[in-house]
């Protein structure tokens, strides 16, 4: 049986977002923390914090919504895992994808760390496409 911690993280965020939860808890790792940092910097989540639990720790991700209580609208419209254990997706610097014609982001792991598609294009590096968020 395969387990994919990044897909699990994205699914937890997607599910919590669909029912307008205030936050969701995710088992922590360094890669997940970097992905949360990108989501926060790009404005897809309100915040996240690391909670020590004596084991690996927990990332509490605070979701972001537009509007008031009655007419609430999601900031994250879609979040999809691209590269997974059965099918790795790598791109070079000339073929970095644009998500929703630039309205979304692609998250990549590169030799320079975890970057968005825009940052990877600016630095001229390719890598493994982890996820699309729009």
Swiss-Prot record:
One of its GO terms (cellular component) is ribosome. Gene3D superfamilies: 3.30.1370.30, 3.30.1490.10. One of its GO terms (molecular function) is rRNA binding. It comes from the Bacteria. InterPro entries: Ribosomal_uS8, Ribosomal_uS8_CS, Ribosomal_uS8_sf. The lineage of its organism: Bacteria, Thermotogati, Thermotogota, Thermotogae, Thermotogales. This is Small ribosomal subunit protein uS8. Belongs to the universal ribosomal protein uS8 family. One of the primary rRNA binding proteins, it binds directly to 16S rRNA central domain where it helps coordinate assembly of the platform of the 30S subunit. HAMAP family: Ribosomal_uS8_B (MF_01302_B). GO terms for biological process: translation. Keywords: Ribonucleoprotein, Ribosomal protein, RNA-binding, rRNA-binding. Part of the 30S ribosomal subunit. Contacts proteins S5 and S12.
